[in-house]
């Protein structure tokens, strides 16, 4: 940001209409609707940003206000903030019967006029023409009034058309326009209305309050583009939405309002796979036949498909309804490809044309956009922002933001992942780096005898036999452990955690950035750090053979692992070794080793086994997830060379048990000390209805019962789900049970009732995260609260305020969820690359053959899980199969007669990764080989 008094003399000289120079004053709607344009490095005019505009953007959209603040702070933009509300000649008072919006528009016009007069006066004695002050607004009435007052004003499109980068900047314009377009309006008037108009906001709010309408988040069906659902609080099952009309322009994650149909009209979810890409392949983005005048036959077919796939199993009926309004859009920029078939072959290369952009997220609809760069963008991943979705339009409209690179290149795929899951990956700015110790990587723990502040109230634990146990190549070592026998027969065990809060002080630029990022994000080939690497992989990392600051939890435990007492202390440690899980396991099991370090690991392991037994006896769940390990080429290419299931050893459990013990102990301490604002983590019990399908599957296909009355009952039931003929069956059931669970979440202790604190999966009445402050911001907050609880330092004011803690919890819950999704998507991408490489390595190139398990049956296909690769896929059939929803099975024709395939069956599949020639999306295609070869049907 530059100060208004430091305005450069003539502003920008490159615009065709203003050769003598100019400045722009955008109104509020320009920032609300054209932020991608303003942020573009190609948009170069100096901007006079009015206080009125800043305040209005803040009230209308906090995310856009955050982006605006970043622009103001950017050194790449010439933005001059003018506090017009405090200037005697530009401040305005709202007039009687004047709306707040009209008052603000009048204030903006007055400021523009004042600046124009001010500049003309300053230029009076110069021979050259004074620069022009240009008011940018897409409000036709505002432009008319400005012109009446002698103010130079242009619409955004008019202004951009005169810039030297107009071809690229015009593509960035949002499809939505405040004033509308006469031609477009006429065209829209001729179109058939496809969707019901949304109810007014006041009607929606009143309806939800009265209970006549219901509110929840929209979820698209991954298997059927004609079906969606809305999770409504208090409903045992989601509200089902069948067909485009019922979903009514909802986009994944939108907060929508639904109207329930009478119970006689309730339906069951789909029992068939309906692929959007195949159904929409022939749509024309620029043809009204693909829009409001879409063929009545096509509409009828879609409605029939939605009905036919729904009501086959009356026992599974659930609340059914339609969307009548949207409370909050979840729209953002989406990673897409240009659909090759939507390009016009008759237009010139530089002509603007309407094309389809297909999002990589299959839960999203195709997006229409106009661009002059369509031919150049083919084959690339691009970023597209959603702007509007009109009732007469089959698809939403958006605008091009920028190109990300060639599809399937690792660089473009990595950036796509980060953007798709909203992972902040910008380099740490100067203000953040200035928070680091000035010594940089030469910082060391000072000698104790110097009496430096680092040693204040810290225990000297450097002589303890401490070690860390982590995955291979771990650089951000958060935790280390020790155990030793005590003279009284008990055992001392310690968990030592990196003292991140010593370096990250509250309400500093580095702290605010860590709070915004929320967590470190781990991709297969890259780590996006929450904190600068100087801290995460060096000064805070508990490396071996160097002294480090720590926060220690130390227990006295009985030989049976009962807690005698626990204490918490700031400390200095010197780790004696950094093991991988495999190295620690080998050391523990080696009978020839009996040194202090090995004895400590064995002692820790014996305690961990007892701690785990106690947890399981209390009802903790032993669930499973399909985790795989990607082996990358050590060369610069980092190509995947193999995929294997992760192997879990005793030492994995050893570390897990002591981290759980530390987290539970710290949770008790901080909740006792700060009952109103303690940062805790909970896992709510899932509704019993979440398990109904799995219970029915187990009973009908295996004769097994699943008791979900409590976590302990569920754990005992899962232990009994054993098939002697299929060793992997129990793991498969545990994976399926995991998917019935709710997600764990961070929360503020004073915001919920005490009865809801518990962690269902761990069977613990209270829990928090303390053990990974290098990579989780929640742990940093827990450290600060624990330090205050033991009297080490006063608690910062921000952690005394419940509303502030609630706000942080909301951010880090979202960041944590998105980070997990980004990590899984990265694994899926590299598994796909590995499969493609294996396909190419085979002589026939026909695909990789693996065992899989059927996890779901449809009328026209099977969903299968390939445990070795940790991936799911669809095997689809076009004809001749017979579907039985009661037995969750398909009967397929075989060479020796019909063969029945049901959920839980082991099958053999051929796997290929194909690239859709239109969308450029990689798609896993599976074909059944055994018990029936489905290649021919």
Describe the role of every protein-language-model region:
Residues 27-34, 50-52, 136-138, 156, ...:
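Structured beta-strand/turn binding interfaces of compact recognition modules in eukaryotic regulators
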Residues 32-34, 39-40, 54-59, 65, ...:
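Eukaryotic short linear interaction motifs
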Residues 36-39, 60-62, 147-150, 158, ...:
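Short coil/turn segments at secondary-structure boundaries
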Residues 90-100, 127-129, 235-242, 366-367, ...:
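Short interface patches used for recognition in eukaryotic signaling and trafficking proteins
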């Amino acid at each position: 940001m530059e100060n208004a008094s430091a305005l450069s003399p003539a502003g920008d000289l490159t615009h065709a209409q203003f050769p003598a120079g100019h400045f722009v004053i955008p109104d509020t709607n320009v920032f609300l609707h054209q932020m991608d344009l303003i942020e573009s490095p190609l948009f170069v005019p100096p901007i006079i940003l009015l206080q009125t505009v800043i305040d209005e953007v803040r009230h209308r959209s906090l995310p856009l206000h955050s982006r605006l603040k970043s622009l103001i702070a950017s050194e790449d933009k010439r933005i001059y903030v003018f506090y017009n509300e405090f200037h005697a000649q530009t401040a305005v008072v709202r007039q009687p019967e004047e709306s707040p919006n009209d008052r603000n528009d009048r204030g903006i016009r007055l400021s523009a006029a004042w600046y124009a007069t001010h500049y003309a006066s300053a230029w009076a004695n110069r021979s050259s023409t004074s620069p022009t002050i240009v008011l940018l607004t897409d409000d036709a009435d505002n432009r008319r009034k400005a012109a009446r007052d002698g103010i130079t004003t242009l619409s955004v499109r008019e202004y951009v058309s005169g810039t030297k980068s107009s071809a690229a900047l015009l593509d960035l314009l949002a499809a939505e326009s405040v004033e509308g377009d006469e031609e477009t309006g006429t065209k829209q008037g001729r179109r058939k209305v496809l969707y019901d108009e949304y109810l007014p906001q006041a009607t929606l709010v009143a309806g939800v309050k009265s209970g006549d309408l219901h509110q929840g988040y929209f979820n698209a069906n991954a298997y059927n583009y004609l079906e969606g659902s809305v999770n409504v609080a208090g409903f045992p099952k989601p509200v089902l939405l069948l067909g485009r009309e019922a979903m009514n322009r909802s986009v994944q994650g939108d907060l929508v309002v639904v109207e329930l149909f009478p119970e006689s009209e309730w339906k069951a979810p789909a029992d068939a796979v309906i692929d959007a890409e195949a159904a929409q392949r022939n749509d024309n983005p620029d043809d009204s036949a693909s829009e409001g005048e879409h063929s009545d036959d096509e509409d009828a077919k879609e409605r029939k498909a939605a009905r036919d796939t729904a009501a086959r199993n009356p026992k599974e009926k659930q609340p059914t309804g339609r969307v009548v309004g949207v409370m909050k859009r979840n729209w953002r920029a989406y990673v897409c490809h240009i659909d090759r078939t939507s390009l016009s072959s008759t237009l010139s290369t530089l002509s603007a044309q309407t094309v389809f952009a297909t999002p990589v997220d299959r839960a999203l609809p195709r997006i229409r956009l106009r661009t002059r760069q369509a031919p150049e963008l083919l084959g690339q991943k691009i970023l597209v922002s959603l702007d509007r979705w009109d009732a007469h339009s089959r698809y939403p409209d958006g605008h091009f933001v920028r190109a990300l690179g060639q599809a399937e290149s690792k660089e473009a795929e990595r950036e796509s992942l980060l953007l798709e899951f909203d992972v902040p990956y910008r380099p740490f700015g100067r203000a953040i780096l200035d928070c680091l110790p000035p010594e940089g990587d030469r910082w060391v723990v000072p000698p104790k005898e110097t009496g430096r502040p680092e040693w204040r109230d810290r225990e000297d634990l450097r002589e303890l036999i401490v070690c860390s146990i982590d995955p291979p190549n771990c650089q951000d070592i958060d935790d280390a452990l020790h155990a030793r026998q005590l003279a009284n027969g008990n055992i001392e065990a310690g968990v030592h955690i990196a003292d991140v809060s010593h370096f990250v002080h509250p309400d500093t630029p580095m702290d605010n950035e860590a709070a915004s990022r929320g967590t470190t994000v781990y991709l297969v080939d890259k780590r996006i750090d929450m904190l600068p690497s100087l801290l995460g992989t060096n000064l805070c990392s508990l490396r071996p053979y160097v002294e480090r600051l720590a926060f220690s939890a130390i227990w006295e435990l009985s030989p049976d692992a009962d807690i005698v007492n626990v204490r918490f202390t700031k400390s200095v440690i010197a780790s004696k070794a950094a093991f991988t899980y495999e190295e620690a396991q080998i050391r523990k099991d080696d009978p020839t080793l009996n040194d202090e370090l090995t004895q400590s690991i064995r002692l820790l392991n014996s305690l961990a086994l007892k701690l785990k037994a106690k947890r399981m006896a209390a009802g903790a769940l032993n669930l499973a997830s399909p985790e795989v390990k990607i082996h990358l080429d050590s060369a610069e290419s980092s190509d995947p060379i193999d995929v294997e299931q992760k192997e879990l050893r005793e030492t994995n459990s050893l570390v897990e048990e002591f981290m759980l013990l530390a987290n539970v102990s710290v949770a008790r301490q901080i909740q006792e000390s700060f009952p109103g604002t303690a940062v805790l983590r909970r896992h709510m019990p899932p509704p019993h209805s979440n398990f109904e399908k799995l219970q029915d599957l187990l009973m009908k296909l295996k004769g097994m019962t699943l008791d979900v009355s409590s976590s302990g009952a569920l754990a005992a039931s899962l232990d009994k789900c054993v098939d002697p003929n299929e060793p992997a069956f129990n793991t498969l059931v545990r994976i399926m049970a995991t998917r019935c669970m709710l997600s764990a979440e961070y929360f503020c202790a004073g915001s919920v009732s005490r009865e809801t604190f518990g962690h269902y999966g761990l069977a613990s009445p209270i829990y928090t995260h303390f053990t990974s402050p290098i990579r989780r911001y929640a742990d940093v907050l827990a450290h600060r609260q624990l330090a205050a609880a033991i009297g080490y330092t006063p608690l910062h004011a921000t952690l005394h305020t419940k509303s502030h803690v609630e706000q942080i919890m909301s951010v880090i819950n979202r960041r944590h969820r998105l980070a997990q999704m980004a990590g899984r998507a990265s694994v899926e991408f590299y598994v796909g690359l590995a499969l493609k490489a294996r396909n190419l390595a085979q002589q026939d190139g026909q695909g990789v053959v693996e065992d899989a398990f059927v996890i779901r049956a449809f009328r026209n296909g099977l969903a299968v899980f390939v445990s070795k690769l940790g991936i799911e896929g669809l095997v689809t059939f076009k004809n001749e199969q017979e579907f039985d929803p009661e037995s969750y099975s398909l009967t397929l024709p075989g060479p020796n007669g019909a063969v029945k395939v049901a959920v839980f069956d082991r099958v053999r599949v051929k796997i290929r990764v194909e690239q859709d020639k239109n969308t450029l999306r990689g798609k896993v295609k599976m074909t059944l080989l055994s018990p029936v070869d489905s290649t021919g049907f």
